[in-house]
Amino acid sequence: MGTLHSLIAYPLFRLTICLATGIFLFDTWWPENLSWQYGAAIWLLLVGVCGGLFWLSHWRWRWLFGGVAGVTFFLWGGISVLHQRETVQYSWAGEPVIYKGIVESVPEVRGKTLRAEVRVEMQRLSGRKWKRVDRNILLSWMPDSLSSPLACGDSVCFYAKVSRPFSEKELTGFDYGDYLLRKGISGTALAYAGNWRCTGKPHSLSFMQRAKVCQQKVVDVYQSWGLEEDVQAVVSALTIGEKSELTPELKAVYSAAGASHVLALSGLHVGIFSCILLWLFYPLTYLKHGRKVLALLVVCLLWGFAFISGLSSSVVRAVVMYSLYTLASFCSEERFSGMHSLVLAAFLMLIYNPFFLFDISFQLSFAAVFSILAFYPLFSRSLCIKNRVLRYIWNTLSLSMSAQLGTLPFILYYFGSFPTYFLLANLVVVILAGVILVLTFAALCLASVPIVGNTVITLLEWGTLILNKSMQGVQQLAGSQITSVYLSSSQACLLAGVIICLYLCWASGIHRKASDWIRLLVVCNLFVAVSCVEYAGEAPEQLYFFRSEVYTRKKDCVSTHRSETGLLCIRNMHIAVLNDARWRTYEASSRFPLEYAYICRGFKGSLSQLDKLFAIRQVILDSSLNDAFREKLIRECQLLKISYTDLSVQGSYSVVL
């Protein structure tokens, strides 16, 4: 109970809650046509009032000062997220134009294309005029043998259509365009071969670019070791956060086993690495002020580790939290400095970038650490074990249960699945992750040493293979994963409330009151009641046309419909998916009734030919069609008086069945 009371009494915790609430509410509800400057004017007024109250320093006005300060940070959060959104959003031309930019990340292979983040600096207007843009996009390009390959830091000139990706939220619950916007990316584009050129090599790289290049060089070293593909992919992900080589099958194995967190560089890896460093440099503690020197040395080395891993947001967040915790230990011996440093880290990161609040890894990371700080002492003290090995096992299980308990509402809300054997998997993961980290850094140092280097690399490969096989074994156990348990936002909030009430009840110990049990039971009953109402409600089944596929969705269940001929019958509704030239040679004595003709990339022919075979009620033009062919089909629809829907304008089309 003391942990929570100490946290609530911490002024920065209250201000952080106000800041986060402002970010969330303004991002969700602020009208798009209303400028953030109106809120800024009110904020300046509140800052003046807050300063005046602080200067007067009357004890009886302390609540007023606290309230005004809370509203001030609430508005600051809202204004900052609106300003951040404005700096990312851009009205791109609705057609291909020429752009100039700089490659900001290391290009990665995506099927037949390469993709990288590009900082678009200029857009060409009519004539020889150029317009300043200064926005980041995800640029994909087809390899061109006539142009030198692009690398991080290169200047590039390309001809392409830049646009914001269409939202998939109605179908999948995920808005890719909004996701990119919160990552600071304004749009996406595809440049075909011959439509891009490398116009210059960099004289100097930015600090972030140097980190990305450093990360790629480490990946190149891993590739030179001749490891198996899955082994190299896991080593790259586990040690430096490079996940592009992870296959969907490998990700599914770790997800089902409840160990996917080991593939995302985060606090677990920083914690393991810091333990290794503390053990290596422990002799420094025998010197005068040795403990402080050791702590500062570990912090510096952790920031070096963050640089090598490409300064990814997850590892930077973990290192910031560790650094603040170390600083707090210098300034205070208070028991709750860990919780305070966690709040300070969240506050500083939201001030720096308010979009962090919507990052799933940010939410999971802070929820896990908060839950560990709260629940781990309760779990670990619940059993008194004297045997060292058994105590280590119990402490590891306590850590896993604490983290899983805090992240449970987020996992069920975002992913709708729960790994049943996560405790078994994490017993293996924690040990082998540490072994792989040690062997990897040893291999980097000793790879050039004859015999010794090859031996370490072989041990690394064996250790990673054991990890992969162990996770496959856990995945193959009966009932290894509970799926399709999606929670609504209200259910997730109530489940979080249940967990908080459970903590309050457990932490009270012998001082537990009847009110603690009543509070827990009330929230549990609310959660059950809301769940019953939401699951009992009938949701209509809907038909979707999106990305050259036909889907049906009922609640959280999405099904894809395909056939060899392209003809579908869904609820007595006839649909044709047209993506080839097969219908050009067909003839018919009578026209077949067709509710929807879904024309996609690859279709050869014309609507006049289709009109002889089918009585089409509505044509749907997929966004994959090129502009000239789409315009031709639209003219034919108008001529034949057939209604049509252009998905290049709205992204997807849905019908209630």
Descriptions of predicted regions:
Residues 1-29, 328-329, 334-336, 442-473:
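Hydrophobic alpha-helical segments
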Residues 1-90, 94-96, 317, 500-517:
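N-terminal leader/targeting segments
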Residues 2-5, 57-66, 70-261, 587, ...:
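Membrane-interface helix/helix-cap signal primarily in integral membrane proteins
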Residues 14, 22, 59, 189, ...:
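Hydrophobic alpha-helical transmembrane segments in multi-pass membrane proteins
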Residues 22, 101, 160, 238, ...:
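Divalent metal-coordination and catalytic microenvironments
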Residues 28-39, 360, 419, 482-487:
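Membrane-helix interface and helix-disruption motif detector
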Residues 145-148, 154-161, 179, 388, ...:
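Non-globular, low-confidence helical/coil segments that flank catalytic cores
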Residues 207-222, 234, 242, 250, ...:
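Hydrophobic alpha-helical segments of integral membrane proteins
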